[in-house]
Amino acid sequence: MQAKSEIGITTMKQEVNPQDTSRAKAFGLWIKSPMPMVTFTKTFDVTRLYKVCKRRGVKFNTLLCWCMGRAATRQRVFYLLPEGEKLYKYDRLAINVIVNHKKGDICSCDVPYSDDFYQFAADYDRMTQTAIDTCESSFDEEAMIIGTSAMTATQLDSIVNQYSGVFNNPFLAWGRYRKSWFKVWLPISMQFHHAQMDGGHAAQYLEDLQQIINHL
């Protein structure tokens, strides 16, 4: 479960001129929109992911989050993010994971994406356990964050309207997976800022995610 990133990237977070990027037109159209977020929902065949987790003793959500990060490395738009009325370029990605801490509330941590799954899994376990124990969130300001939320208390068909007006990051959310005969299914909702990417980018991302799961 190792793969080499296909993206040529810079060395640090930096502000860029939107007009010098492929997002110039979209940035002008959407950066001041009162509701610039779009949500897609796709039902994934996660049978392969489920079997790999069972066979190797890997946590389902850990491997799923790694696959999400892996799919994002295939598109340059994931290394751009609008903040306020500016556009920033990043050199790396991280996955935000929400956990229930010991005081009964929630907090989160930004787990750095690595092409090496086992490195990612080690960071995931360490950072989520620290968040649970300390009841404090940790943030990586130098990475483009892919938000996630696993609400596994029930099965969910779709999750929408997560826009806060503060966080413009791509956000993926899901409920409990569903078993049907010899298949395991999981609807996943993806919210994205239209200044960062178009619907075609998001659709391709979801397709890439399915293919990565299929080839674990």
Show which residues each predicted segment covers.
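Domain-scale detector for complete catalytic domains at protein termini or as standalone homologs
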Residues: 3-35, 47-52, 69, 81-85, ...
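Gly/Ser/Thr-rich phosphate-binding loops and adjoining beta-strand/alpha-helix segments
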Residues: 6-10, 16-19, 31-63, 79-95, ...
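Acyl-group handling in specialized metabolite and lipid biosynthesis
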Residues: 38-41, 49-56, 104-118, 197
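Acyl activation and transfer enzymes in specialized metabolism, enriched
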Residues: 49-74, 186-205
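Active-site loop/lid in soluble adenylation, ligation, and acyl-transfer enzymes
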Residues: 63-65, 69-81, 87, 104, ...
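Helical lid/core segments from catalytic subdomains that handle acyl or acyl-like groups
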Residues: 101-156
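Histidine-centered acyl-transfer/condensation active-site motif
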Residues: 140-155, 170-207
